[in-house]
């Protein structure tokens, strides 16, 4: 029995498990991604976890004996900090200093904050709760959105779960569709805020969580590169060797980003630049190198959203085994494609209905991809997955391409 264990154990149940290794994008088909699940559960064991109890008068409260740094970083829908023993109000009513959830649904205005998280998000950045097909919750929060009330595993008890970071499609979320196999940088920052000590920059060069608007793009020149690390410092010009590392991650929407520093990696499954969100404009400057030359590397990966514009003026390469220089691909769902499947204008299973489509995928993944620089990939210079529609590709004067151009786009694909 579990009572006999002298060390920790993770009980994950029986599913149709896929043992596919961790890659930049999941490739597990209809199976439930076992390695990604283990990473998810380990983050709970490492401290991203809320424990609640029921008081004699029937209210939920934060447990006194299991209230740590994660609990201290939680804020309710009014910005109030959680405290040990504080009662929790589900439904927006504040009784004598309760920790208030705006409503009794999955999204209720709760968020997590800490010094490391704020360092990653940047001053003044607010985040929305992700679009997953439920009735939308429009509130913006100055931290990491956290899930609210959920049913327990038996579907009997409705309780404040408060243990999952709700970044769009994130590994550490409770969303029904997730295409991340590793934590995003802001999630790693949360682990630092709950006490773990590690060099976050080994895995992420820089991340952009801020958003502009349709009327006014958020303009940013990224002078942060990605190289090897030593004693917490960049070794400029030396490629990073970290597996699954990412040089630049664009999470927010309506950004106009110019990449003005080299990104150099030879790590397995590493990514130069990963783009998500809606209507982001990315320019890779002339004389800038984005190199992801390790096995299964992707120099440019556009993995979610719609209507992005990419201008490639520099030197982009993925010269390792199975390397793809420019990859346009939503990837699989770590819960299995039979649970929910997404792509450009594609939404099946889960909360999907026949008469609507999620706004963030209601359009081409990429509106225009302009190439005037160098694009070299060992497996492909350009790869378009069956899930992803790229509206326009322009190979301009002065461009150099080495490698295949592969398009598998299929709006009726069998997944």
Where in the sequence are the language-model features?
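Extracellular zinc-dependent metalloprotease catalytic-domain scaffold
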Residues: 1-39, 44-219
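A generic structural micro-environment signature
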Residues: 18, 69, 75, 94, ...
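Surface-exposed loop/turn motifs in large extracellular/passenger domains
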Residues: 213-402, 409-415
